[in-house]
Curated annotation (Swiss-Prot):
Keywords: Ribonucleoprotein, Ribosomal protein
Record lineage: Archaea, Thermoproteota, Candidatus Korarchaeia, Candidatus Korarchaeales, Candidatus Korarchaeaceae
Molecular function (Gene Ontology), one example: structural constituent of ribosome
Example GO BP: translation
Highest taxon above the source species: Archaea
Family classification: Belongs to the eukaryotic ribosomal protein eS17 family.
Protein name: Small ribosomal subunit protein eS17
Ribonucleoprotein as UniProt keyword: yes
Amino acid sequence: MGTVRERAIKRVAYKLVKQYPDLWTEDFEHNKMILSQIAEIKSKVYRNRIAGYITRLKVRERQGTLV
């Protein structure tokens, strides 16, 4: 079974992907860097979880399984 993420992480990730659709890629390190530039997130753990979920959303978008 996969990791269940907090609702707040999902909410922020969906909002950022919708607001800046062309900035994100399937590369976690790239997404982490972009997230640091456009959002002021003080917690490194929180930033990494959001970047990881955005990465997962982009992979699902490519595979055609994103609803």
